[in-house]
């Protein structure tokens, strides 16, 4: 529709581009790049042409294992799957336009987002959502055993509530002078054990089981 000029005469202030193929197990590179790179590129050039603010979803997966840190700079970036590569590829493409762009381009690197309305996400739903479903189905929560120096359930992630993500998006909408790539997380990591124990405490019963990785 954008390529056909359907939106050329519309008065749009901002585009929040949150759509993507987010399946980290997807190995079809052509499919992933069409959805996560080519479509986003089309949106960006439309926004630049019309001087519309563009705030798009990048991903903390662009940091890989995190062994290089989590700063928004190339030295920390290491895509480990097709999804992460597609996100990083567009981030690097967008970087070429930041300085000369006459309208806002912002990429938000979401960490582990959780919250309501995750039913449609299947295996890509948040760990918290999956733990709740495990308890409802089996009365217990399962976590992976330790690996790569981590103890049982001691793997860590930065979990951010979806409504806080919305607030961050709106912050950048209110500050059109800002451009670039920004992390979108809490800045604090929590273990899977902490989450699992919180779920069990909420329900008031159940057990925690560790399974081989």
Predicted feature locations:
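Conserved active-site helix of classical SDR/Rossmann-fold NAD(P)-dependent CH-OH oxidoreductases
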Residues: 40-41, 88-95, 129, 166-167
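Conserved Rossmann-fold NAD(P)-dependent oxidoreductase catalytic core, especially the SDR/UDP-sugar
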Residues: 15-17, 41-82
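Short-chain dehydrogenase/reductase
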Residues: 33, 79-88, 122-129, 158-159, ...
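Short alpha-helix in the Rossmann-fold core of NAD(P)-dependent oxidoreductases
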Residues: 33-40, 44-47, 55, 86-87, ...
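Short alpha-helical oligomerization interface
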Residues: 24-39, 71-79
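NAD(P)H-binding glycine-rich loop region in Rossmannoid oxidoreductase-like domains
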Residues: 2-35
């Amino acid at each position: 529709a954008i390529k056909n000029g359907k939106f050329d005469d519309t008065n749009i202030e901002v585009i929040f581009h949150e759509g993507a193929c987010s399946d980290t197990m997807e190995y079809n590179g052509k499919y992933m790049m069409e959805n996560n790179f080519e479509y986003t590129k089309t949106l960006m050039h439309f926004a630049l042409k019309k001087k519309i603010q563009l705030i798009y979803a990048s991903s903390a997966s662009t940091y890989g294992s995190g062994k290089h840190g989590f700063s928004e700079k190339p030295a920390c970036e290491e895509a480990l799957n097709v999804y992460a590569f597609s996100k990083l590829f567009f981030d690097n493409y967008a970087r070429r336009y930041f300085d000369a762009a006459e309208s806002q381009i912002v990429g938000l690197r979401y960490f582990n987002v959780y919250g309501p309305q995750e039913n449609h996400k299947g295996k890509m739903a948040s760990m918290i959502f999956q733990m709740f479903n495990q308890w409802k189905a089996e009365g217990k929560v399962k976590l992976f055993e330790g690996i790569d120096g981590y103890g049982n359930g001691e793997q860590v992630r930065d979990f951010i509530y979806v409504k806080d993500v919305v607030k961050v998006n709106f912050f950048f909408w209110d500050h059109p002078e800002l451009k670039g790539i920004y992390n979108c997380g809490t800045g604090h990591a929590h273990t899977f054990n902490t989450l699992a124990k919180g779920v069990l405490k909420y329900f008031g019963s159940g057990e925690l089981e560790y399974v081989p990785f």
